[in-house]
Every structure is written in structure tokens, then in C-alpha cells.
Amino acid sequence: MSVEARAPVNQSVERAARLLALFSVEEPELTLAEVTTRLGTSKATAHRYATALRRAGLLRATPSGYTLGPRIVELAATALAGLRIVQVAGPHMERLVAAVNETVVLSVWDGEAPVVVRVDDNTNRLVRINVRTGSRLPLDSAQGKIFRAFALGEEGLDGVRRSGLAFNARIVEGIAALAAPVFQGDELVAAMALVGTTAAIPDDVRSELARALHETAAVLSAELGFLRPEERRTA
């Protein structure tokens, strides 16, 4: 038995971790009663843990209960920055920003939704698009469509699979995103997107922006060891 396996479990730490894990994309806010029931403790105990986590910035109190706090976002961003895909993608994203003069965003799948792991801002435009690292994106975002098409194999997204591009301009008014898949081996590992105003990002897979994005994602995928189906057959 390893030393780690024999180590005693700190019940307070374990319970605090379980409390934080109760929150999800589907349930970003929970009442104290819901926390109490799911944690399997008394209301007083649940309140004590929630109060301690709130003071640490890991929970935020709302009029009806709690949501995850701002410190969670900071910790998530720190963890995500250590991912290999973030480090390898950096130079490619910087070159793409310089080429197209738009903000470039990299997202990975956390099991439920796309999560932003790196943002390279366009600093030359009058209007800058601020995308926060650690943000979870909707499933109908451009990045969400990429994961739904290539990782989840959803029906109704054949156009995305054929073109290798997904567009959305309905998440935030006036803002559009165009995304492409990034593969490692034969698996989807990330979605790379151009984000800008609807005037700057066209819904056109044949545009210069679309071509530049698609080529950058393909070069990054090749660096990560992606082989096209025809290359796998001859390898």
C-alpha cells in the first residue's frame, strides 16, 4: 500500500471539496437547503462550511443561496495555464493575431462545456473584445459546436464537420466567433476561435479569416501529432 493510500483523510477538507463539487453548469446556484441535503449534513454544518468557503472567495452568497466565487476562476485559470496544449498553441495564436488583427481564443472541453484556457488579444483595434480565461462557454457557441460536432458526434452538425469551421453571433449581441478544431493524435483536444464584432467576423467559411484560422488550427494539430484518415491508412 502506498504512503498516499495510508494517509488519513482530513474530513473537513474532503467535505469542503464535496461542497464545491455540487455546483455545475446546469446548477450554478444552490440554496442552503440543497447544499445541506446533498452534503448529508445538518443545516448548521453546511452553513459553517459555506461561510468558510465564502470568506476564502471560493463561494459567493446570493439572495437565494450560493454560487462559486471569484477565487475559483483564478485557481482554474492557473491550472489550465499548465496544460500542454496551452503552451504549444501560444506561438501559433500569436502569429494568427498578427495576421488577422482579431482576438484569438483557445478552449478545451471540461466534460460539460468548453472552457477558455488562453486568450491572445488584438490590441490594435479601437474596440477590444475581452474574453476571460477560465470562462465556460455555452454549448451553442462556435466553440461549443466544434466539440458537439467532433467530440460528441451530434447530428445536425454535418456542415461543421465538412468545413471544419463553426460560426455563432447570437451569444453576445454584436459579437461573433468563428471556431476550428484542434486535434492531438486522432482526438479533438481544443477549439481555436476568432472573436470580434459581427462586422469584422463574417459567417463565411471561404473568407480570408476562415482560411487563416483553419490553416493555423491544422498546423497546430500536425505539431500535436494529428494524422488525417488517409495518412493513417498509409502509416
Residue positions per predicted region:
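Amphipathic alpha-helical regulatory segments at dimerization interfaces
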Residues: L22, R38, Q87-A99, T103-V105, ...
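Amphipathic alpha-helical effector-binding/dimerization core
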Residues: G65-E154
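Juxtadomain coupling helices with adjacent low-complexity linkers
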Residues: G156-L157, S163, F167, E173-I175, ...
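A short, aliphatic-rich beta-strand micro-motif
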Residues: A176-V182
